């Protein structure tokens, strides 16, 4: 499928030199690496050593000329950090071309609703993302706010319109947030998936 772009969201822990070489060979992959602040705040949610693994992965991907950025889950606790000049400068220094921002959504057993951003923080991110993207005074990284930037992609792109999600089991889902599937990438071609009732 060389005429299709594939984008993967990853925790980056399995990215090594062999992986990067294979990505260069294939040529149609880009990546969003999970990152939720500097080492302390990131590793408190992602696990000890994750921050260092993400930094190593970025260095390797940069060395091989791959296209990558970050996927940032912002919470009440880390919002100021992940929108700070210092954090954005680190991303730029590490070769990130973009940064997706998703607000924390508590789900499942043991959910932590106290981490949801406040209404004031939700307003602030809209303003701050636009400051970062500005031609004057902005940063050399393209930032997108998943919940508030629909105007730039024509609204929701899911359901096969421009995008669908493949989970870790290979199930094709309309969206990363909608866990329904009637087809699996192991048993169906991409065209068959897009022609299945869930995507039509």
Please place each PLM-identified region on the residue numbering.
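Short acidic, glycine/proline-enriched helix-loop-strand junctions
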Residues: 4, 50-55, 68-78, 107-142
């Amino acid at each position: 499928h060389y005429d299709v772009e594939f984008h993967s969201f990853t925790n980056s822990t399995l990215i090594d030199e062999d992986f990067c070489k294979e990505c260069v060979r294939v040529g149609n992959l880009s990546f969003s690496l999970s990152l939720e602040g500097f080492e302390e705040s990131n590793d408190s949610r992602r696990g000890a050593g994750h921050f260092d693994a993400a930094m190593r992965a970025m260095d390797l991907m940069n060395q091989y000329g791959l296209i990558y950025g970050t996927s940032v889950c912002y919470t009440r606790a880390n919002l100021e950090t992940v929108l700070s000049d210092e954090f954005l400068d680190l991303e730029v220094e590490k070769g990130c071309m973009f940064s997706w921002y998703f607000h924390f959504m508590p789900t499942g057993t043991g959910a932590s609703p106290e981490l949801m951003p406040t209404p004031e923080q939700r307003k602030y991110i809209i303003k701050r993302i636009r400051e970062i993207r500005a031609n004057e005074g902005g940063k050399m990284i393209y930032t997108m706010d998943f919940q508030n930037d629909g105007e730039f992609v024509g609204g929701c792109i899911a359901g096969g319109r421009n995008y669908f999600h493949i989970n870790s089991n290979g199930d094709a889902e309309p969206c990363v947030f909608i866990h329904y599937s009637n087809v699996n990438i192991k048993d169906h071609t991409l065209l068959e998936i897009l022609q299945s009732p869930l995507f039509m």
